[in-house]
């Protein structure tokens, strides 16, 4: 029992430090699942991902090209959830996401068929594969919202 608590505490400290390195933590009392993470790339910085008080994260927060992600107070991001931003995803206070929710403010791929054809001929690290080349629009989810398992919310929602 004591070893389990110690192990859980060490996992929390490790996750807390990973999140602190890649996101702006503006409060306290966080819970991070073992598979949770923040990914910032293509010019994004920790200032682009803001996590408020009493937030539970069991999924992934992904920002590219300065895409903003803001999680309000007492928000829960369920297991295997993905928030993928190249523009802006704002989740207001007291919102809960069940497991396997995907929220993407972009199409993850270019709209133009000719650009997609070009993209398919490049390496998986090529700039053409970045979300900034896809259609994108901000997403705002208000206060006290519950998102059910496996919905997909896309740009402009």
Regions found by a protein language model. Name each.
Residues 1-111, 122-126, 131-144, 148-151, ...:
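Domain-scale signature associated with acetyltransferase and cell-envelope carbohydrate enzymes
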Residues 114:
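Unchanged
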């Amino acid at each position: 029992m004591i070893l389990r608590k110690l192990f859980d505490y060490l996992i929390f400290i490790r996750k807390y430090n990973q999140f602190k390195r890649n996101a702006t933590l503006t409060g306290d009392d966080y819970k991070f699942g073992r598979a949770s993470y923040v990914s910032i790339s293509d010019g994004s910085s920790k200032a682009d991902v803001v996590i408020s008080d009493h937030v539970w994260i069991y999924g992934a927060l992904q920002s590219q090209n300065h895409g903003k992600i803001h999680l309000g107070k007492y928000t829960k991001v369920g297991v295997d959830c993905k928030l993928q931003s190249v523009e802006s995803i704002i989740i207001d206070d007291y919102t809960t996401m069940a497991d396997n929710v995907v929220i993407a403010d972009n199409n993850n791929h270019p709209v133009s068929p000719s650009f997609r054809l070009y993209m398919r001929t490049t390496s998986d690290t090529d700039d053409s594969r970045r979300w900034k080349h896809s259609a994108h629009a901000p997403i705002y989810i208000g206060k006290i919202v519950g998102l059910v398992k496996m919905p997909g919310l896309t740009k402009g929602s």
